[in-house]
């Protein structure tokens, strides 16, 4: 073994490379009692590696099945594992697993909702996030401001932002009234607030932003906000093949999951779990659950894969 420490730890399932690089930079990782440095290579697989003082394995989990969740992130949740102020995070509602942990594939701003993928495979997460892979992300965005042919052309051709040139791969107009306009936009990287900053460069303010697609994985219209579903084997392998990883042969869920009755029961189960979570986090101390009970927000309809792509031709585009 002679590889960079963050790569070894990512393959062992302790996080994505970016997450682990941040941990190493902050001095939270040690090797044989010595604080590790970014770029350090691990040559001995018997070395004692600690993260936050806890000994962790550096052996690749070859026999652990790669799992992927599709989560419908609501507005207001933070993409972090722990928040010192006690605010909700995207990890709060995910199912508990033994011997591994969920790793988020990228991030969404607190005020952005929609599809967020999680996986148990750190290498898969890292490759999907890396700009060199050019994995498409599609968003439904509502903007306030004057939008014309010239501005749309700028967004497609490219705009110089603080961190370099950025552009939309596609901009599709879906309607609007007055100064409010709704578009589907596609980008192939995940820079911080990139969609919002692109529109701001054209003097338009984003009033609503929702991710509806990552690669060819679409936000399921049956999924409520705050709900999750585990991807089937074919979808997991689509993501793995997209970034040149070997396909999986097993899955943790049933292969035959097409029954309407089963789908309906699963959807109801997810909704009940979301409701219980909402009641728990919204109950002030000293008050009963019944006194603080409120209804969870209804999931708004979302265009699925068929509607998003097959109806693309029916969306009227502004003249470029």
From Swiss-Prot:
Top EC class, one word: isomerase
Record key words, sorted: Isomerase, RNA-binding, rRNA processing
Chain spans, region Disordered: 254-320
InterPro entries reported in the protein's UniProt record: PsdUridine_synth_cat_dom_sf, PsdUridine_synth_RsuA/RluA, PsdUridine_synth_RsuA/RluB/E/F, PsdUridine_synth_RsuA/RluB_CS, RsuA_PseudoU_synthase, S4_RNA-bd, S4_RNA-bd_sf
GO BP terms: enzyme-directed rRNA pseudouridine synthesis
Catalytic activity as recorded in UniProt: uridine(2605) in 23S rRNA = pseudouridine(2605) in 23S rRNA
Protein family (similarity comment): Belongs to the pseudouridine synthase RsuA family.
Protein known as: Ribosomal large subunit pseudouridine synthase B
Gene from which this protein is expressed: rluB
